[in-house]
Amino acid sequence: MSFTCRIKKELPDFSLDLSFSTDQKRIGILGASGSGKSMTLKSIAGIETPDEGQITVDGQVLFDKEKKINEKPQRRNVGYLFQNYALFPHMSVEQNIAAGLKGTKEEKIRRVQEQLARFRLEGLTKRFPGELSGGQQQRVALARIMAYEPQLILLDEPFAALDAFLRDQLLQELMETLADYDGTVIFVSHNRDEVYRFSQELLIIDDGAQVCFGDTKELFLHPRKMETARLTGCKNIAPAKRLDEHHVSVPDWDLTLTLQQEVPSELRYVGIRAHMFEPLWGDMTPENVVAFHLSDVAEYPFEYKYYSHSPDICWYVQKSSHQEIEERGMPKYLRLPEEEILLLW
């Protein structure tokens, strides 16, 4: 199934300006809070109206400003899962699933029974939302959406208010329950781990502007743009200048990089993820190293996070790899392996 979204909308704090098209089934939207992610979903669902553009699902036009097409939300065949699931508190599970369904009584009963079985809710039919766990509430909300047989499902940060353990558990449940759904799912989050795990393709938004759109794993591995690197979790990014085809100056790190690959002319920044440094001891100073001056350390259950000043560097070390540091002390330098250096613009 194909999906296209090309929209513009003026908002009080920024202008929403997006243009992407895909035939993948699982799409992620990543961005900081207030960057325009929820407004994008509301525009797709028909809750908000863009100032210009077009939205289509599998050839069906949901919105086209020039042609004056703007289908009402209830006619778009789009399911929208809100952050709080928006269940009716005084309705039972089966009543929530049946709410708003059209058709004969027999048809409604059949569709409700199908979703109760699909989402493993058969023993909970008479319970109310307040008597359900977070995972059960999520399944009821999804069952209500799926009873409408939508072409497109929109998930608006469904785990934002949950702790890390429950968030991981519910994400796994969500992926399992949607495994046999043939439509497109758009998953919005400010959590990069969630969108990496869920999505095949990823849209990154920053202050309403489309930073990039493409294969999720490729964007994490080769972000290319500074904003993409930052939003996918790169902790070490510094302004850089191309000196020639194989050399880059990084003044903030007091470093000149020598590279085998050709340096792109559009280069503006250099980055390296915090886990990718190689520690070096002794007075030897090979190419592509930064001096390491420990200013702070934070211990976490499975890793240490070291912070250097002059230059400002973050270095993360897994506890399973920490023995050498315990034996030899802090390294004098950190090496930037060329294959881990991010050349950005």
Predicted stretch roles:
Residues 5-32, 38-39, 46-49, 60-61, ...:
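Non-catalytic connector elements of ABC transporters
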Residues 47, 78, 82-90, 191:
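Catalytic "switch" loops of ABC-type ATPases
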